[in-house]
């Protein structure tokens, strides 16, 4: 039986941040700049796990495709999916974003850090002023959610 040769995935440019780097930068901005009363968190649903752990989490309600960040502000729920500049949504992510919208939540897909910050500003989560911009080398610690 002949094996099909797979074409390698194109390598990311050294100057293009990974999805993880974008995610961490967005969370840093939220920790430092989110309006008072905004709650945000990352539902850990997309990581690779051992089969036993995955089965336990699935039984507990972990669902594939949930947006990278869930935000709650002023009685509204937001789901933000983060992608690299050329990143694509999976089938499960498309379905979940549609389900969020049908349930009344606001959703968006951000391709890159600038897009994510623009969306969060448009939603009123981050202030529109650029006076509080985060320095690129800043590191924050603490929980991945904000408590008013």
Protein language model annotation of sequence segments:
Residues 1-148:
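Catalytic phosphate/metal-binding cores of nucleic-acid and nucleotide-processing enzymes, i.e., regions
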